[in-house]
């Protein structure tokens, strides 16, 4: 059962902050920090044992306090943290015409249990609603309270999407990509009805409690160990290994890593975020931010020249290895093995439970399992959107389209350009 107040009949100017005088006060109780510009809209979604009231905000800055507070107790990846998405919006989203649509879900006790960071792309072509950060995020998903995941039904998710689309208005396409099958220990109800996409997630390495355990099982795998590689590199020059670099060196190393990694797509996994406009500025801004303690930048240098480097994120007892830069040489191959072993050792010491090789191929494939499946769903919400989606799926069936950015996809957008 779904109950909702009629939200239609407003002009776009009326919806700019998604609030009117008739909307009523912001919620009280445990989550009083909801910004006053959020809409107390009365959208009510009833699931199996959860009744959610949705509130929508179109300002990332005004959502900061409640977002940061909620992400500390919610199930989420680093790609849905405020630090990540606020930097993404400033450097990638806003310049490309994406408008934020931040959805808060409250339970019957007015406790925040759901946060859906969405973006509406409307600069050109069909108006597309997608996860905020789409195209750069390794995984797209909401932030969810663990208690909600225990009872949340796919039918409730469908109702939420319908209410959001009705509220935003004039949405042509709902596009949901790179969605993981699991949210923490729970099945992700937001992949209900979605298809397995061609792009996979990262290869997961589950870490033991001690380095000795890892060494006993894995160090003999491969032609050379990290120790062998270290001895080899010391013969080449002065070897330095920097893990978790501080802010200023971190920014300079990020520039080097991105410059090399862009030209070495073969060393990347299927997740390669470096082709999107504004990504370089995004990573540098993230590296310089003192508030982003989860960002990890590491490098192996010989005579002060970077041979291998990586950018990763620590979140929820998992290290997400997102970008790697390896020199195409014997020195680079040795530095890669040494860097990965040192990262693994450091993670074990810090008590991190796993490493997700999201943007890299493990130095030794036997270390990890198969890539995790990711799910995508794309649906037309208007006649224009249905036509675009139909052409896109037809193109894929004919083998003409493999991504949103290829020639066929561009042609489809031009055909229906607003």
Model region roles, listed by residue range:
Residues 144-146, 205-207, 245:
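Short beta-strand-to-loop capping motifs
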Residues 169, 224-235, 397-405:
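Short, cationic low-complexity segments
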Residues 46-47, 134-136, 233-236:
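Short, flexible turn/loop "capping" segments at secondary-structure junctions
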Residues 74-78, 168, 172, 261-269, ...:
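A generic secondary-structure signal for well-formed alpha-helical elements
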Residues 2-51, 60, 180-217, 296, ...:
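Active-site/acyl-donor-binding loops of N-acyltransferases
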Residues 133, 157-160, 216-224, 392-397:
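Short intrinsically disordered coil segments
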Residues 52-129, 179-201, 216-332:
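A conserved beta-strand-loop-helix scaffold within acyl/acetyltransferase catalytic domains
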Residues 99-100, 107, 121-198, 315-376:
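Acyl-donor binding region in acyl/amide transferases
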């Amino acid at each position: 059962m779904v109950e909702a107040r009629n939200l239609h009949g407003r002009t776009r100017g009326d919806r700019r902050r998604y609030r009117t005088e008739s909307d009523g006060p912001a919620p009280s109780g445990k989550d009083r920090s909801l910004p006053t510009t959020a809409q107390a809209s009365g959208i009510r979604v009833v699931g199996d044992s959860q009744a959610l009231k949705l509130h929508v905000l179109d300002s990332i800055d005004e959502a900061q306090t409640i977002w940061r507070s909620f992400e500390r107790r919610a199930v989420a990846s680093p790609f849905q943290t405020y630090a990540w998405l606020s930097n993404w919006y400033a450097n990638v989203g806003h310049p490309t015409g994406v408008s934020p649509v931040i959805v808060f879900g409250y339970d019957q006790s007015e406790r925040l249990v759901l946060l859906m960071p969405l973006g509406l792309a409307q600069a050109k072509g069909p108006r597309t609603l997608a996860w905020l950060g789409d195209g750069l995020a390794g995984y797209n998903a909401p932030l969810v309270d663990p208690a909600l995941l225990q009872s949340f039904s796919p039918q409730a998710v469908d109702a939420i999407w319908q209410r959001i689309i009705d509220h935003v208005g004039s949405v042509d396409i709902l596009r949901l990509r790179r969605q993981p099958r699991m949210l923490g220990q729970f099945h992700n109800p937001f992949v209900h009805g979605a298809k397995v996409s061609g792009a996979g997630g990262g290869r997961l390495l589950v870490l033991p409690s001690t380095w000795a355990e890892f060494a006993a099982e894995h160090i003999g795998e491969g032609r050379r160990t990290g120790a062998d590689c270290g001895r080899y590199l010391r013969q080449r020059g002065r070897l330095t290994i920097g893990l978790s670099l501080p802010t200023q060196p971190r920014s300079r190393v990020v520039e080097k890593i991105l410059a090399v990694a862009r030209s070495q797509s073969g060393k990347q996994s299927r997740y390669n975020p470096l082709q999107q406009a504004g990504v370089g500025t995004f990573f540098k801004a993230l590296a310089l931010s003192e508030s982003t303690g989860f960002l990890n930048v590491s490098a192996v240098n010989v005579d002060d020249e970077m041979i291998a480097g990586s950018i990763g994120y620590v979140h929820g007892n998992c290290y997400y290895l997102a970008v790697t830069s390896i020199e195409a040489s014997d020195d680079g191959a040795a530095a890669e093995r040494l860097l990965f072993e040192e990262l693994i050792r450091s993670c074990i010491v810090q008590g991190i439970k796993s490493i997700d090789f999201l943007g890299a191929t493990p130095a030794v494939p036997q270390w990890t399992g198969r890539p995790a499946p990711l799910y995508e769903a794309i649906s037309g919400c208007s006649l224009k959107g249905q036509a675009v989606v139909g052409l896109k799926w037809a193109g894929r069936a004919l083998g003409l389209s493999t991504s949103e950015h290829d020639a066929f996809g561009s042609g489809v957008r031009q055909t229906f350009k607003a």
